[in-house]
């Protein structure tokens, strides 16, 4: 089948993205296999003030949510703008990828991606200051994500 014809039958919302967890314990093939079977989603671009209840309210519209793990700043132990949403079934997770990715939550456009499965310790930000790496180098002022970036100089 031609690549154009394949694109017509592809469900780009459900396809596995190019992103790979650099801290995954295993090889790329093993990670790819887990992602294709996963029922867990990574959710990014959340406000630091978004609650677990708000996440549940939105994501439960796509199916039965098993659990939500809010991402925490590893130093302050406060929310740092991401979470994991685990569903009971792959089908429900696929529905969330189709219908929730790119929507607004707490006045922010959120993004979802497949996750190979939550492991203890992954709920913490990986940035040097304890939060997410992307927030350390952000140059714009974003009050919903802690103001200015932590590493860049402020005006």
UniProtKB/Swiss-Prot annotation:
Xref: SMART domains: RRM (SM00360)
CDD domains, per database record: RRM_NCBP2
Basic and acidic residues compositional bias, start-end: 133-143
Binding site for mRNA: 19, 42, 111-115, 122-126, 132-133
GO biological process: mRNA cis splicing, via spliceosome; mRNA transport; nuclear-transcribed mRNA catabolic process, nonsense-mediated decay; positive regulation of RNA export from nucleus; regulation of translation; regulatory ncRNA-mediated gene silencing; RNA splicing; snRNA export from nucleus
Coarse class of the protein's main subcellular location: nucleus
Keywords: Cytoplasm, mRNA processing, mRNA splicing, mRNA transport, Nonsense-mediated mRNA decay, Nucleus, RNA-binding, RNA-mediated gene silencing, Translation regulation, Transport
SUPFAM superfamilies with a match to the protein in the record: RNA-binding domain, RBD (SSF54928)
RRM domain span: 39-117
Family matches, as InterPro entries: NCBP2, NCBP2_RRM, Nucleotide-bd_a/b_plait_sf, RBD_domain_sf, RRM_dom
Cell compartment(s), UniProt: Nucleus; Cytoplasm
UniProt GO molecular function: mRNA binding; RNA 7-methylguanosine cap binding; snRNA binding
Chain positions covered by the region annotation Disordered: 122-155
One cellular component (GO) term of this entry: nuclear cap binding complex
Family the UniProt entry places it in: Belongs to the RRM NCBP2 family.
Role description: Component of the cap-binding complex (CBC), which binds co-transcriptionally to the 5' cap of pre-mRNAs and is involved in various processes such as pre-mRNA splicing, translation regulation, nonsense-mediated mRNA decay, RNA-mediated gene silencing (RNAi) by microRNAs (miRNAs) and mRNA export. The CBC complex is involved in mRNA export from the nucleus, leading to the recruitment of the mRNA export machinery to the 5' end of mRNA and to mRNA export in a 5' to 3' direction through the nuclear pore.
Subunit relationships: Component of the nuclear cap-binding complex (CBC), a heterodimer composed of ncbp1/cbp80 and ncbp2/cbp20 that interacts with m7GpppG-capped RNA.
Protein name according to UniProt: Nuclear cap-binding protein subunit 2
Lineage of producing organism: Eukaryota, Metazoa, Chordata, Craniata, Vertebrata
């Amino acid at each position: 089948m031609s690549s154009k014809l394949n694109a017509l039958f592809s469900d780009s919302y459900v396809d596995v993205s190019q992103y790979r967890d650099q801290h995954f314990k295993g090889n790329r093939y093993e990670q790819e296999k887990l992602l294709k079977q996963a029922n867990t989603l990574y959710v990014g671009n959340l406000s630091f003030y978004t609650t677990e209840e708000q996440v549940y309210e939105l994501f439960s519209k796509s199916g039965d949510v098993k659990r939500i793990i809010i991402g925490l700043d590893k130093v302050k132990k406060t929310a740092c703008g991401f979470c994991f949403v685990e569903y009971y079934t792959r089908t429900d997770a696929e529905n969330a990828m189709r219908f929730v990715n790119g929507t607004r939550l707490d006045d922010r456009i959120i993004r979802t991606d497949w996750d190979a499965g939550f492991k203890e310790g992954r709920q913490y930000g990986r940035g040097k200051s304890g939060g997410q790496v992307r927030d350390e180098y952000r140059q714009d002022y974003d009050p919903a994500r802690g103001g200015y970036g932590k590493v860049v100089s402020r005006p």
